[in-house]
């Protein structure tokens, strides 16, 4: 069995799927069911993090306006999670302008960790840094609605037996992967 993993935005990995470069794509939850067979994998939560010595108050519940005033470290504009974040803030009359834009979630954590600003990250993908205390979550007085990561295959295309087995493995693993009892997501009000 040959496994090839390609990384990219939801749009990019779905293009890989259409081009036949991959059998399965993991993407955000807004995919057309007429085009894709979609399996829910996990809900994700957006949080803001900073280095423990960053000049902010980790006990204060920040408003959207206060978060927007920080030097923000965000994913690049074409990332679906970035677009989702911007739309959410705009719906509440707040514009966000990042100081730093990156193409990698790991880089968001790395730059926040060294004190370059406040990063907007996916909580579920940041557990290592949060658990080790190299980044800390900022409390907010708002809660960004969760998003879903889905496993997509092309509608009408039967996955290979190996791909099907992998999909079943992922589906079973996801039932145990995230323990909400250890969430670092803090909101008030």
Language-model-detected regions and their locations in the chain:
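Hydrophobic residues within well-ordered alpha-helices
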Residues: 17-18, 67, 110-116, 151
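Central regulatory/effector-binding core of bacterial HTH transcription factors
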Residues: 1-34, 102, 186
């Amino acid at each position: 069995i040959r496994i090839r993993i390609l990384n990219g935005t939801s749009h990019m990995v779905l293009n890989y799927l259409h081009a036949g470069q991959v059998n399965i794509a993991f993407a955000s939850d807004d995919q057309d069911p007429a085009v894709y067979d979609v399996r829910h994998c996990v809900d994700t939560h957006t949080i803001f993090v900073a280095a423990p010595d960053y000049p902010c108050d980790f006990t204060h519940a920040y408003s959207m306006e206060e978060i927007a005033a920080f030097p923000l470290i965000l994913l690049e504009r074409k990332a679906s999670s970035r677009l989702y974040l911007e739309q959410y803030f705009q719906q509440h009359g707040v514009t966000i302008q990042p100081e730093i834009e990156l193409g990698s979630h790991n880089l968001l954590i790395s730059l926040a960790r060294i004190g370059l600003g406040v990063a907007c990250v996916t909580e579920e993908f940041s557990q290592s840094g949060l658990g080790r205390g190299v980044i800390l979550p900022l409390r907010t007085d708002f809660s960004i609605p969760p998003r879903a990561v889905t496993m997509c295959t092309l509608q009408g295309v039967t996955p290979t037996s190996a791909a099907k087995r992998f999909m079943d493995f992922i589906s079973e693993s996801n039932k145990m992967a995230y323990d909400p009892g250890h969430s670092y997501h803090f909101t008030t009000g």
